[in-house]
């Protein structure tokens, strides 16, 4: 099992995740670019805001930010979206990552509007 040791390593891991096949324009669904996700998460990591912390990926879509948090050592990540199909993709993406990397944190998937979280 591998570990993430750099921002570029994180970007590569995130680039392997599945995106939306048919994004719903009405709810502004899109897949976050892996480089942007890696940049944001790496900045938070450098500030000590991810390792051993609980994260919430609100409006998670395909789960790139929550999965990135788990890759960087978050103790738990909540994945919240009001679209069951998006959560299904996020769960599949987590399985992909777990097959390659050691993930010790827990994941919780919630189908809910973020206002109800």
Spell out what each predicted region is:
Residues 62-74:
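Conserved SAM-binding loop of SAM-dependent methyltransferases across substrates and taxa
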Residues 76-81:
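Conserved SAM-binding motif I beta-strand of class I
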Residues 44, 48, 73, 94, ...:
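Active-site catalytic pocket residues across diverse enzymes, especially alpha/beta-hydrolases
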Residues 53-61:
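Conserved class I S-adenosyl-L-methionine
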